[in-house]
């Protein structure tokens, strides 16, 4: 993933959390044979992930999902 794409995706996650008044209180990095991503959680529930592969920059879950 290019650095600019990474920063734009990270900003999108942060902006959506701010808009919806969601506090991201945990960030985990997953890197194994299947996942290469950064997961963002609020109160123990995953609300977004930032995919570090070519498949797509980010996904939203739960309270951050449309």
Put a short name on every predicted segment:
Residues 1-27:
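N-terminal acidic leader/helix
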Residues 29-66:
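Detector for the mature cores of small, proteolytically processed
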């Amino acid at each position: 993933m290019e650095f600019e794409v990474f920063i734009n995706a990270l900003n999108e996650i942060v902006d959506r959390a701010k808009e919806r008044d969601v506090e991201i209180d945990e960030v985990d990095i997953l890197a194994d044979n299947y996942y290469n991503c950064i997961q963002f959680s609020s109160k123990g529930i995953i609300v977004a992930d930032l995919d570090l592969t070519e498949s797509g920059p980010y996904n939203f879950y739960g309270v951050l999902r449309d």
